[in-house]
Amino acid sequence: MRRYGEPPEKHRRYAFRAGVYAILPLNGSLLLTHQAEPTPEFQLPGGGIDPGEHPLTALHREVFEETGYRIAAPRRIGAFRRFTYMPEYDKWAEKICAIYVARPIRPHGPPREPGHTAIWTPADLAVDLLAETGSADLVARLLR
């Protein structure tokens, strides 16, 4: 599995964290999440899989929490790993990020996740906006 970002530090212990993220295209645009804290950045909607939770259940839950949208027809297109510090949890993690393409159905209200805003952006600009290089690379490959 391809790794993005910095290599793991030999002396550091990393908690395993599996996550699911969605590329949500509609009419030439992508639905992204802008997270205000701890560092403002654009992200693919998604996040961690809770213990015992099915990845697709987590994907639907995370997209809804971060964007307010329901989704349909998710299809896995790739995965990557990264070793990173997660300040919101105050821990170092080995993240396995599964990426799906899904169809956004319609909004059911604002994002429920504090500090998150759902943003529609032209698809060709999304690659440059995304803070995480693995996500940006998979979006770029999808758009080719």
Regions found by a protein language model. Name each.
Residues 1, 77-78:
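Local beta-strand/beta-hairpin segments that build beta-sheet-rich folds
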Residues 14-15, 22, 41, 118-119:
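A residue-level structural signature of the nucleotidyltransferase/glycosyltransferase Rossmann-like core
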Residues 138-144:
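A small-molecule sensor/coupling module
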Residues 25-66:
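Conserved Nudix-box catalytic region and its N-terminal flanking loop in Nudix hydrolases
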Residues 21-23, 29-31, 98-101:
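Residues embedded in well-ordered beta-strands
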Residues 49-72, 80-134:
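Unchanged
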Residues 1-21:
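Acidic, metal-coordinating catalytic segment for phosphate/diphosphate chemistry
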